[in-house]
């Protein structure tokens, strides 16, 4: 999934006035968490988030297509926090965390290290 598509999907869920660079910065927090779990280098955002008119590079996000919902659910929850809508934030945050946990569990299952047969008890 591309970053700008995740932002558009979140905007469809929660119309807001937050600038695209700031939304990209919010998504990078989740992307760094995912990169750390994967053991990959975390991508960097090449835009000045203070400049609300700056264009954001449309980079590919780390999670594959089956787990794209993590990004727009997480961003929607953060938009609820930004809008100070605590009731929606609590629900959306729980849903987003569940989606991220499922995606991370899937990744760990699919990318498990080869067992050497040595067990320590």
What are these regions (language model features)?
Residues 15-21, 66-68, 72-121:
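Short loop/turn elements at secondary-structure junctions
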Residues 55-67:
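Short, mixed-charge amphipathic alpha-helical segments
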Residues 1-58, 102-121:
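Conserved short "hinge" loops at termini or chain/domain junctions
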């Amino acid at each position: 999934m591309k970053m700008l598509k995740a932002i558009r999907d979140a905007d469809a869920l929660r119309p807001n006035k937050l600038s695209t660079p700031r939304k990209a910065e919010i998504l990078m927090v989740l992307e760094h968490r995912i990169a750390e779990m994967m053991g990959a280098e975390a991508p960097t955002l090449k835009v000045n988030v203070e400049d609300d008119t700056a264009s954001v590079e449309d980079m590919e996000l780390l999670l594959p297509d089956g787990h794209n919902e993590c990004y727009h659910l997480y961003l929607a929850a953060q938009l609820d926090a930004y809008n100070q809508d605590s009731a929606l934030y609590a629900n959306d945050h729980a849903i987003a965390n569940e989606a991220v946990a499922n995606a991370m569990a899937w990744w760990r299952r699919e990318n498990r290290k080869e067992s050497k047969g040595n067990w320590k008890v």
